[in-house]
Amino acid sequence: LGDVYKRQVYEIMNSTLNDRITRFMVVVKDWDKIEQLGSIRSARPTNFMLAAEWNAVLCHDGGPFFINDWVAKDYSANFSGGFARYSNGKAAEFTEYITYDKYTNTQKGKTYDGLKQRFANSKYTTTYNDYYQGPHFKFADGEVTFDDRSDAISATTIELPFKHNGSTLKYNEETGTYDYYEYGSAHKDADS
């Protein structure tokens, strides 16, 4: 996920089974720049709650019966399934991706609508609707340090409680940001 359209990334525990496996959820502002984003997986109630906080349209591939109440909420906007299928050599559940415009899988000879077509054929707007609550976060204009605080603690390594993949954030002094690690190694995007 390149910096071109990255907005907010959540790592969410999807199940208390399977060693508390996690999935990523990305909130994208500049969705009209998406060439390929995914893979798209099934949703849980948490995905609907977070999408509503951002006044976003949730893109997912269905889910268990207990998401039905969330799909039915007035503020819930979502596109379920039918996204582009890429022939990438992976299992079927890892081949579904969001695109902005139509995509044709030349190996299968099938064309899939992108977000552009899906919005045009839906009741959803591409601008904020009546449920928009305003800006989500407020960040400092400049760097904030706690060097002058005697009670400050070091936060160079943050271990998140996800046993399955051992998610860890490690502070990178060169960039002044945290790098994400899982399974003991730095996680790199395709653009990295």
Where are the regions that the model predicts?
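A surface/extracellular/periplasmic glyco- and lipid-processing/surface-interacting theme
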Residues: G2-K6, Y10, S15-S192
